[in-house]
Amino acid sequence: MKRDLYEVLGVAKDADADEIKKAYRKLARQYHPDVNKEADAEEKFKEVKDAYDILSEPQKRAQYDRFGHQDPNQGFGGGGFDGSGMGGFGDIFDMFFGGNGRRANPNAPRKGSDLQFGLSIDFIDAIFGKETDVEIPKEAECDTCLGSGAKPGSGVDTCKTCSGTGQQEVVANTPFGRIVNRRVCSTCEGKGKVVKEKCSTCRGSGRVKVRRKIHLNIPAGVDDGAQLRVTGEGEPGANGGPPGDLYVVLRVKSHEFFEREGNDIYCEVPLTYAQAALGDEIEVPTVDGRVKLKIPAGTQTETFFRLRGKGVPHLRGNGRGDQHVKVRVITPTKLSDKQKELLRELAELSGEKPGQHGGEDEGFFEKMKRAFRGE
């Protein structure tokens, strides 16, 4: 049984779009197969993505809130009635007026289906953007039969089963009375036509599998889960209809040093207790290269410093976010006799005795050690 989508993302049913996006980004980062090596990570990542794809779209979310996981177009089951083929107002007219509803023309031009392709990019490429070529597996119109599915020189006949409508009518008796239900014709698969001899290249489908090279311009500032739309690079249309679109979903790899929250970047750098106590000027890595950062005397562990304009470029508009640098004071694990002696002298100069604990008489040395540990 499928889990509730709000439960999957860990948000309330009245959560707004920002809350849903924030929850998705957190879970996507946690379960991304490039980061999480657990056996079920990929399955959880897909579950999170599927939940976000629905809840992030207002129309899909409204439909889910109303019908849940059930297909809203699904009819009644059992009783000799199969509602799987029902859809649209034409079927309702069929039910009450004996099949006079408007039918869709199976030979009318139809737009091709959209394609989705996942692309992993490096953290730095997401910050500054990148131009790249990717090969997309897709279907294309068969060059031999030009999409008809028929062997060149052979004809195409109107389907005798459905008389070219592409649909079969099935009569069912239900507790509600006699119902006429339409479903896709099993002979022509909804096309309304049947080829006399199938094309040997595509075996009658009118399509062949290809790998198409697509040039992508990834803009600076994209985040994990962003989609790039490439118009006309989806599946081919039917009966002369336009092709669908290609949606490239970006998966940003994690970085060993930087973390990102919105347009801001976070990192952590170590300090010795001497640097923290006396102050210093250190070099800090940024996505632009190393910069100088002044550490004032008396800096405590887990203090944050801001490097303005060193974050992520705004995807829409000018400017960049900031980089936040958290310093962590490192307590030495091994001290030489000379170092221990100097620390004891420092404690004595402060009027305290090392080794004492509690109240105002607590030794300076122990206080300092715990401060360095962040306690």
UniProtKB/Swiss-Prot annotation:
J domain location: 4-68
CXXCXGXG motif repeats by residue range: 142-149, 159-166, 185-192, 199-206
Domain of life: Bacteria
Subcellular location field: Cytoplasm
Keywords: Chaperone, Cytoplasm, DNA replication, Metal-binding, Repeat, Stress response, Zinc, Zinc-finger
Pfam families named in the record: DnaJ, DnaJ_C, DnaJ_CXXCXGXG
An example Gene Ontology molecular-function term: zinc ion binding
Residue numbers binding Zn(2+) 1: C142, C145, C199, C202
Keyword S-adenosyl-L-methionine: no
Cofactor(s) this protein requires: Zn(2+)
Region described as Disordered: 349-375
Zn finger region (CR-type): 129-211
Biological process (GO), any one: DNA replication
SMART domains in the cross-refs: DnaJ
This protein's GO CC annotations: cytoplasm
Binding site residues for Zn(2+) 2: C159, C162, C185, C188
Similarity field: Belongs to the DnaJ family.
UniProt free text on domains: The J domain is necessary and sufficient to stimulate DnaK ATPase activity. Zinc center 1 plays an important role in the autonomous, DnaK-independent chaperone activity of DnaJ. Zinc center 2 is essential for interaction with DnaK and for DnaJ activity.
Function: Participates actively in the response to hyperosmotic and heat shock by preventing the aggregation of stress-denatured proteins and by disaggregating proteins, also in an autonomous, DnaK-independent fashion. Unfolded proteins bind initially to DnaJ; upon interaction with the DnaJ-bound protein, DnaK hydrolyzes its bound ATP, resulting in the formation of a stable complex. GrpE releases ADP from DnaK; ATP binding to DnaK triggers the release of the substrate protein, thus completing the reaction cycle.
Subunit record text: Homodimer.
Protein name in UniProt: Chaperone protein DnaJ
